[in-house]
Amino acid sequence: MSALVVGASLGCDSRETATASESPPPRTAGELSAYAGSESCAECHREAYDEWKRSHHANAQRDLDPALDDEVFSPRREIAHGSQTSFADTKDGRYVLTTAGRDGKMRDFVPAEALGVFPLWQYIIPGERGASQLTELAWDPVAKEWFNVYGNEDRQPGEWGHWTGRGMNWNSMCAPCHTTAFRKNYDPVADRYDSKYVEKGVGCESCHGPLKAHVEWQRKHPDGGFFGDPTLKKLTPDQYLAVCASCHSRRGDLTGRFAVGDEYFDHYDPAMPDLSQTFYPDGQILDEDFEFNVFQLSYMHDAGVRCNTCHQPHTSKIRKPVNDLCLDCHQSSMGGRIAIDPATHGCRPHGPDAAQCTDCHYPQTPYMQRHWRHDHGMTIPDPQLTKEFGIPNACNRCHQDKSVDWAIESAEKMYGERMDRPTRRRARVLARLKQHDFTAVGEALELLAAEKNGAWRSVFLRMLTPAVYEPRDPDLRQAVRQVMIDRLGDPSPLVQSAAIDALEPLGPAVSDHIRPLLHAPYRLARVKAAWALRHEIDLQSPVGRELSDLLVYSLDQPTGAFRWANFLNETGKPGQALSWYKKAVEWDPHSAPFRHGYAVALSRLGRLDEALAQMLEGVRLAPQDGLFAHSLGLVYGEMGRLPEAREALARAVALVPDQSRWWYNLGLAENQLGNFDAAVAALEKAEELEPSVADYPYALATIYLEQNRREQARAALGRVLQIDPNHAEARRLAEQP
């Protein structure tokens, strides 16, 4: 079983006959007639329109412009990147990018539009079946040079992340946030897009909603009418925040239908700090998050700060110089605020190089090689966490010539006991959990119970999830499971979602606890619950349709194909699932999990030779993943190739030594090969890891009986009956003379 992961990379199969049960119909074209276009706003809102027109939002996607693009392609430019060399040129009056295509051959590609303004822009190349691709080669308008946004990764044709692959597909990856009112309109049967949008760039109606009715009413009532304009709806600060967050967050899309005024968690599943390498344990960004994700974790978010508190909405620029902006709130301690004295606060309070608040509390990280992004978690630098866990601090980001110990000493001199703040304790606990240090679980549960921020509560649950399955400490395991069950009732959709993800692999044992969330207030929790209960869900029910919508929307990416294949496979349609697994592998051939899922499905259908080929490739792609080695051993076992099975299973337990079932399977393989001592050792290890499982001592008992070691067999059978007094086979063997 697998948790419902809603990512940016999802997928489909165009060769399978579409039926209601196996290939959901494509979404029809979105209704765009309610939009008037940004130009109409200029009639009454000229100042705001002019500010917007010059903004990055307005120019997020644009037509080609000789004033901007001539110098990019003329004179001819050679672009060296990784092992490849590409060229930008002008041919027959057209801009041309000569680079490796999908087949690996050098070809001329003619860009149709540009994406982005500063500090870089990329070009959109029209493709087949309504798809467009975004170049990995970008132009730096300041340095006036080409570069590869992936640096020296040297992505190759055929890879998901190559510019010709699904990972660089404009319709799926770029257009929703670089156009206004975008509708993807993907047909999974034909593998074709019929994408539509109102206008290029982030237009007025991206943030204000469709305004055609407003424009028409205003033209008919230039005096404003007696009761005012009935077409306008007033948004709350959180609704405005959701508008910004719909693009300024790293998230999975649940619907593809977010509209101004909607709840964020009815449409998106944001990435949050967890066991992956996306965030540091203290919440700082490691990989790109596009601002909103960590902003939810900040004190400022909880205090009511919203995007337009600091940013002018039409220019997107900050409203005033950085320090003045912060001091608007931090001049006094009214309302529980932390008062800042600019004359003494920080390490460089005076002079022309005086520190900006953002230097310490909004540290920058470069993405796409040259795009520096501020961390919006508004964290407080703590060099001590750098020394203990490698978590970066803003002090050493600036003072790169100084040691971490110097930064620790300097911070202690300036702030003293204030450095030992609750955020340090929280970061330490989460860092230990991320290292699978279960001695931190007790303190984590204590902090979780006291945590007021729902986003942080969800982080605790994500970090605690491995403890739900800790085999060596049943008391700890049960305690954490109960906390997860209790947190299903948390008011935060992030917490509900994290709890469902943690519990879902337990299957029917937790179904009754999860089932009430089919009626949760937010779609995020509802679809997670529906996925967890997919074996019983009616796809024609309201929540079933929501789950179906999610599965449909993501069918143009390999993760979507894989998820749909899992759905079919786990709901009794393994034959139908195969082509979707195959499509996931074709679209992302370097994904070991996709090959593993495909191999398991093939194996269950008895197609062992094909399963073995996929499993071997999965192990080659992820040689340090014990799960794949274990599954390879099982396939070899099914094929009767016991020496290879034993070797693969031994590799699996060497990589992940705490999986009791893997030791059990290794023990069975060793026994079949006649390796009695090795079999006993493996089974004893399985029992040591999880002494509450009757299978392990029972297997030992049968092996001891085969060797006529009756005393040891009786002892093992005694342990079986302690665990399960009704174990029929153990009782029968124990009663034998």
Predicted regions and their residues:
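Helix-start (N-cap) detector for alpha-helical repeat units in TPR-like alpha-solenoids
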Residues: 493-496, 523, 558-559, 592-593, ...
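Primarily the internal scaffold of c-type cytochrome electron-transfer domains
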Residues: 15-25, 29-32, 39, 47-116, ...
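Register position in tetratricopeptide repeats
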Residues: 505, 535, 570, 604-605, ...
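Amphipathic alpha-helical scaffolding segments comprising HEAT/armadillo-like alpha-solenoid repeats
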Residues: 438-448, 470-488, 507-518, 539-549, ...
